[in-house]
Amino acid sequence: MERFEIFSLYDQIDDDIEYQWLIDGLIPLQHPTIIYGEKGSYKTLLGLHIALCLSSGMNVCGLESKSSKVLLLALEGSNDVMPRAKAHMENYGYPTESSFYYTSPPFAFGNPALEAILRHEIEDKGINVMIVDTLSQARPKGSFNDDGLASIITRSLAKYSEEWGITTLSIGHTGKDSSKGLVGSKVFQNDVPCILKVKSKKVIVEKQRSGRTGAIFPFTVHEQEINERGQTAIWLEWDDQKMKPRQRMIIQALETLSNEYTDGVPKKELKKEVWQIDPKADPNKTDSFRTQFNRDINELAKHGEIQIVSDGLIKRNKRNNAAD
């Protein structure tokens, strides 16, 4: 006979207790999160931005984030994925190795055959985070207003967290009346632990059981030329982290190296990492690169983004980016 796994509180109460986060205080680790908004609110771009940051070991919006292997289910099509990823990397730097995967398969929550295929791919590639874009493209037959259908989806999301050991971020829409929030049954609002609303280029923490409920994170969307034909794609920047491209790459390099150098990253190693990820690094212009690097280091320190500690070591300043 199968049995429930039951824990004794007093066997563990003296342990070091802490919440586990994918993105500190914002997105819980191994729990479902829904990101929703109206058409044109950049919610899909936000999902891709989060995926690219997590997969390259970058923090999101200045909040400490867990480096992850990410799978994007681009169920509305993948035509925008590579152009937008290119625009992102032109401004945040190119990762030295890829931990970001995407696919556009047929998929429906609660379908055992499709879920078995998906789970095999997740385990094969060691995926930690799955982004579903969008909920409406992955729903079983029926209406989101049907509590039974909504329960199938929320139970599936919970299963992916509890049994598969992954964190899910699902992209959703508002209904015809956007003031009523996330489209469909109240089951979504009640049963999903974290809900983020995207409106007017702001991420609003609408529901968060243990973190930053009510916090607001404004962002700006830019266009970036991605090829010699002048074609462009959009990328996202958090408003309180506006920096020059090389400065963003310095921050990315610091975050990549911080686990190896816990007391601070040696300036020489930091410069070497930035050189590797900078798409515009020119071997014939090492002197100008070094000059601009030093200038950017001083500017970042002046604005409190980094700290130059003893012996030429550099650390990232931790900041609370939640706005009132």
Placement of each model-derived feature along the sequence:
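Conserved inter-motif catalytic segment of the P-loop NTP-binding fold
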Residues: 2-4, 18, 22-23, 38-41, ...
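C-terminal regions of RecA-like/P-loop NTPase motor modules
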Residues: 6, 123-126, 163, 201-324
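Non-catalytic, mobile gating and regulatory segments of ester bond hydrolases
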Residues: 10-23, 28-29
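Conserved RecA-like P-loop NTPase ATPase core
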Residues: 27, 72, 133, 169, ...
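Pre-Walker A (Motif I) flank of P-loop NTPase domains
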Residues: 29-33, 68
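Phosphate-binding/switch region of NTP-binding enzymes
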Residues: 34-35, 40, 44-45, 129, ...
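Hydrophobic positions on the alpha1 helix immediately C-terminal to the Walker A/P-loop
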Residues: 46, 50
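A short, flexible beta-alpha/helix-coil linker loop
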Residues: 136-139, 174-177, 280
